[in-house]
UniProtKB/Swiss-Prot annotation:
Compartments it resides in: Prevacuolar compartment membrane; Protein storage vacuole membrane; Golgi apparatus membrane
Organism from which the protein derives: Oryza sativa subsp. japonica
Signal peptide: 1-26
Protein name per Swiss-Prot or TrEMBL: Receptor homology region, transmembrane domain- and RING domain-containing protein 1
Protein role: Involved in the trafficking of vacuolar proteins. Functions probably as a sorting receptor for protein trafficking to the protein storage vacuole (PSV) by binding the C-terminal vacuolar sorting determinant (VSD) of vacuolar-sorted proteins.
Length: 533
């Protein structure tokens, strides 16, 4: 419809322009019976212009034809008005018109003597000229000459629009307006065609939806019957259709169900939230299984975060000491086996007893800080009557020294090798077997005293005593069998405990024992350069 209106407007503008141009050029019109001819003319600049609706008359040929001399033919008076037809040349235009005016003619029509096709504006003196004068082409003059003297054929000289200033301005304005309208119409038509023929470019959305892999990772089910009572249990909220048996439904993390095709299209092309509750559907979706198209960067980025979280959890958890409290039956069984003369493997029994002693020493040290002094004294009396309780030397043996003592003969017998046990005490390997025996006996006698007589700093005493027990084990493994050392140590410990409990107080026995130990250690230090107990 728009295109048709545009074409109609163009046709009307062209017709108007042509009509105005035709009216401006048709100044001389020949009208007869069944005959109408129009000719272009240009009015003379020295003659008055045609006014009103025009001027009517009958054309007559001038004699002489060039009208350079007074005319011999006289114009007839009365209507219609006579017009003189004159050829160009021979004299000036104003002379020709002057001679025609003097002969009684009301208008002078001058035609060209050559077929140049160019109409000129006749110039000359306007003094004394009162009739109309126009200039036409040679062809137009030849046609008018044929109808000369015919009173039944009228000739009209019409006013030319281009001859007035207002007419020129109006024609110029109308022409400019017509050209602008044509150009604007062409521009809009061209623009309309470009918009219609150009392919539609989809507008860029602010949100691009979820990937198809994440959508397919959501759980789905086959509809059988309505099992829940909610807005999406029987009807899809997207297409508003009821579920049919056998249709595939997609379950979002918010537990709302939809047709798989409907919700997949919604999540991948429009939004990532549930159409019903507006909850984000991308939360709570597990990662899809790895495939050939899975990018390697995701796994590489995920591993450091997992390892860092593991380290942080390990660092945040406090260290927990692991200590096992063996039952009394197992302790009795172990020491009974180690004290039997027919024991087939003394090394294995020593291993079991040492391991058990280490665990018990851990328990004793952890409980020592909370025990009062009276509890230490009570434990001393219980140790006197117990024949199967493990010796103090073995109870506080360090794990490092026990492994080097019973597994194999120590490779560091001839050197002073220092090792730090778990409790911060230092143990030493001695060079000679005689010094081993004296030093071990002294340390063995000090065992019960350290465990029963509570000094002012019980924990430091027990830690130092652990180092002495390590020396006992090392000396026993290198000088004599573990069985003999163990039996003699038990006997010495019981004698010391009995004497201390019957003769004097525990504190005095402990002080005397420390003095004896310091004296023997100082003598040994001068011989072997060993540190004190």
């Amino acid at each position: 419809m728009n295109r048709r209106r545009t074409m109609l407007l163009l046709i009307c503008l062209c017709a108007t322009f042509c009509l105005m141009t035709q009216l401006g050029a048709a100044n001389v019109v020949l009208m007869g019976t069944n005959l109408t001819l129009s000719f272009d003319d240009v009015e003379a600049s020295f003659a008055p212009g045609v006014k009103g609706s025009g001027f009517e008359g009958v054309v007559y040929t001038a004699e002489p034809l060039d009208a350079c001399s007074p005319l011999t033919s006289k114009a007839e008076k009365g209507p219609p008005s006579p017009f003189a037809l004159i050829i160009r040349g021979g004299c000036t235009f104003d002379e020709k018109v002057k001679n025609a005016q003097d002969a009684g003619f009301k208008a002078a029509i001058v035609y060209d003597n050559e077929n140049s096709g160019v109409l000129i504006s006749m110039a000359g003196s306007s003094g004394g000229i009162h009739i109309y004068a126009v200039f036409i082409s040679k062809a137009s003059g030849e046609v008018l000459k044929k109808f000369s003297g015919h009173t039944d054929v009228e000739v009209w000289i019409l006013p030319a629009f281009e001859n007035s200033a207002w007419s020129i301005m109006a024609i110029s304005f109308i022409s400019l307006l017509a050209m602008s309208a044509v150009l604007a119409t062409c521009f809009f038509v061209r623009r309309h065609h470009i918009r219609r023929d150009r392919p539609r470019i989809p507008e860029a959305r602010e949100f691009h939806g979820m990937s198809s892999q994440l959508v397919k990772a959501m759980p789905s089910l086959i509809f059988t019957k309505v099992q829940e009572d909610n807005c999406t249990s029987s009807m899809c909220a997207i297409c508003l259709e009821d579920y049919n048996v056998g249709e595939k439904l997609r379950v979002l993390p918010c537990r709302h169900k939809f047709h798989a095709a409907c919700v997949d299209l919604w999540l991948t092309t429009w939004r990532t939230f549930c159409p019903v509750c507006k909850r984000d559907a991308s939360t709570g979706i597990p990662d899809p299984p790895a495939s050939e198209t899975t990018p390697l960067l995701s796994s590489a980025v995920r591993l450091p975060s997992q390892s860092s979280s593991f380290r942080s959890s390990v660092a945040a958890s406090p260290p927990r000491p692991i200590s096992r409290r063996p039952s009394s039956q197992s302790i009795s069984r172990i020491y009974a086996a180690s004290g039997t003369p027919n024991s087939p493997n003394p090394i294995r029994s020593f291993t079991n007893s040492t391991a058990m002693s280490i665990s018990r020493s851990n328990v004793d040290l952890s409980n020592m800080s909370s025990r009062p002094r009276a509890s230490h004294l009570a434990s001393a009396h219980s140790l006197v009557g117990s024949h199967l309780s493990p010796p103090i030397n073995i109870r506080y043996a360090s794990p490092h020294m026990s492994h080097s003592g019973y597994a194999s003969p120590s490779p560091h017998v001839s050197s002073s090798y220092v090792s730090n046990s778990g409790y911060g005490s230092s143990s030493y390997y001695l060079g000679s077997s005689s010094q081993h025996r004296s030093y071990l006996r002294r340390c063995g006698e000090s065992g019960p005293s350290l465990s029963t007589m509570a000094p002012q700093s019980p924990q430091q005493s027990q830690l130092r005593h652990g180092g002495e027990s390590d020396l006992n084990l090392a000396g026993a493994s290198s000088g004599q069998s573990f069985r003999q050392s163990y039996l003699r140590h038990c006997a010495d410990s019981e004698v010391n405990l009995a004497g201390a409990s019957s003769g004097q107080s525990f504190r005095q026995s402990y002080l005397r024992h420390c003095a004896d130990s310091d004296a023997s250690l100082s003598a040994m230090a001068s011989a072997q350069s060993l540190p004190g107990c």
